[in-house]
From Swiss-Prot:
Coiled-coil residue spans: none
InterPro entries reported for this sequence: DNA_glyclase/AP_lyase_DNA-bd, DNA_glyclase_Znf_dom_DNA_BS, Formamido-pyr_DNA_Glyclase, FPG_cat, MutM-like_N-ter, Ribosomal_uS13-like_H2TH, Znf_DNA_glyclase/AP_lyase, Znf_FPG/IleRS
Chain sites annotated for binding DNA: 106, 125, 167
Stretches annotated zinc finger (FPG-type): 258-294
Protein name in the entry: Formamidopyrimidine-DNA glycosylase
Reactions mediated catalytically: Hydrolysis of DNA containing ring-opened 7-methylguanine residues, releasing 2,6-diamino-4-hydroxy-5-(N-methyl)formamidopyrimidine; 2'-deoxyribonucleotide-(2'-deoxyribose 5'-phosphate)-2'-deoxyribonucleotide-DNA = a 3'-end 2'-deoxyribonucleotide-(2,3-dehydro-2,3-deoxyribose 5'-phosphate)-DNA + a 5'-end 5'-phospho-2'-deoxyribonucleoside-DNA + H(+)
Length: 296
């Protein structure tokens, strides 16, 4: 599933085609994605201008001059393709490996823009969705009402200590809880925990002192999360088995993975003689170095 860096890469690539443009025609080629489209979805978009394109966690939000916001989630395999008036094509945030990319039969939403560009949403697995929400109620809508803090918006050890205090859940599980920190996924949590030298099964509450102040480990983790995400965004995300940019290029951060999907390979930390191992937590693979990420 596309994580925060991949969705941010999509946003940056898609913004030039959407922001300031008007929906001239919207064609739905099926009645639903993961969920049914909102009532009169195409009609509520047509004639409206996109005034801004933002990201909240793993969601894209396009503000419209109608007072509504188009909320979009890519699911497991969603992607956007942009056909420009000059005949060239872009695929903003194309993180899927060749062979896993969508085909025209999975083009479910086609949006003709006033600029002459055509933006197509393709989703082979149909786990993505689109919704329309009153802009004034966006923060309180069902998608975002219980969502946690943005990790790239001032995340500190003090914030982590406040969120994790008294929690007995494993550290990795707490980091994946979107009600605490929104937008983190399996890949970047594994990478951040390795950089912070923290075991994924350590109790989340251990990052807060009895008085609620952050431990050194909480400060290290906050720094690692921000570094990993910023580096991944700069690299254009990670190209995965199921995920592909808007310009058709691949994300490159997978080449910087230190633990993810590297079972049996030597730990990349200078001076560490350990190897990367894998365990399963909540039906998800966890990759870490048992030598420099010891338990307890």
């Amino acid at each position: 599933m596309p994580e925060l860096p991949e969705v941010e890469t999509v946003r940056r690539g898609l913004a030039p085609a959407l922001v300031g443009a008007r929906f001239s025609r919207v064609t739905l080629r099926r009645a639903n994605l993961r969920f049914p489209f909102p009532e009169r979805f195409a009609a509520r978009l047509e004639g409206r201008t996109v005034t801004g394109l933002a990201r909240r966690a793993k969601y894209l939000t396009a503000a419209l001059d109608s007072g509504e916001t188009l909320v979009m989630h890519l699911g497991m395999s969603g992607r956007f393709d942009v056909a420009l008036p000059d005949g060239s094509n872009l695929s903003p945030g194309d993180f899927y490996l060749e062979g896993a990319q969508g085909t025209p039969k999975h083009d479910h939403v086609v949006m003709a823009m006033s600029t002459g560009a055509t933006v197509t949403y393709n989703d082979a697995r149909r786990f993505g969705f689109m919704d329309l929400v009153p802009s004034a109620e966006l923060a309180a809508c069902r998608h975002f009402a219980r969502m946690g803090v943005e990790p790239l918006d001032g995340l500190t050890g003090a914030v982590i200590a406040r969120l994790f205090r008294h929690k007995i859940a494993p550290l990795k599980a707490a980091l994946l809880d979107q009600r605490l920190i929104a937008g983190l996924g399996n890949i970047y949590v594994c990478e951040a925990l390795h950089r912070a030298r923290l075991h994924p099964e350590a109790p989340a509450g251990s990052l807060a002192r009895p008085d609620g102040r952050p431990t050194p480990e909480a400060n290290a983790l906050a720094k690692a999360i921000v570094q990993v995400l910023e580096e991944a965004v700069k690299a254009g995300g990670s190209t995965l088995r199921d995920y592909a940019h808007t310009d058709g290029s691949a994300g490159a951060f997978q080449h910087a993975f230190r633990v993810y999907d590297r079972v049996g390979l030597p730990c990349s930390r200078p001076g560490c003689a350990g190897a990367i191992t894998r365990i399963v937590q909540a039906n998800r693979s966890t990759f870490f170095c048992a030598t420099c990420q010891p338990p307890g």
